[in-house]
Amino acid sequence: MNIRTILPKDKFDVESVEKLAKRSNDELREILPELMEWLQDGNWPISKPVENLLLRFGVELIPYIQYVFQTRDPQWEYFMLSGLIPRLPLECLRMLKPDLERIIECPTDSEILEELDDVIVPMLNQL
């Protein structure tokens, strides 16, 4: 079965996330970018279940998180910073330090409006 056929169809499709949770990490690796997209809004019903699923990957998520920071989408960045990232091992936070420092030192106007520094400073203080 093609794993992409199980991807959530909409923000309410918790059933698909439950099916994906039964799959191996090897199977899920190919759809990590698509799964990350479901973290664009932490208010979506499937956001937290997808986040729980992604936690299985730990350090492997770093390039995908860095991609989110490169999009300069402050809402998506916010939900990464307030949801997924604090739940990852401290090692991941260390790996993301340059990205977090960039947001603090050279934020975009929208990152300033989203007040991402309020979330980032306590994280950096853990290091």
Language-model segments: residues:
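Structural detector for internal amphipathic alpha-helices that build alpha-solenoid repeat scaffolds
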Residues: R4-T5, D10-N25, E37, P45-F57, ...
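Amphipathic alpha-helical scaffolding segments comprising HEAT/armadillo-like alpha-solenoid repeats
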Residues: M1-R4, D26-W38, V59-F69, L90-I104
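Short inter-helical turns and helix N-cap capping residues of alpha-solenoid HEAT/ARM repeat scaffolds
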Residues: G42-N43, R72-D73, T108-L113
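Surface-exposed polar/charged interaction patches
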Residues: R23, T71, I103-C106, Q126
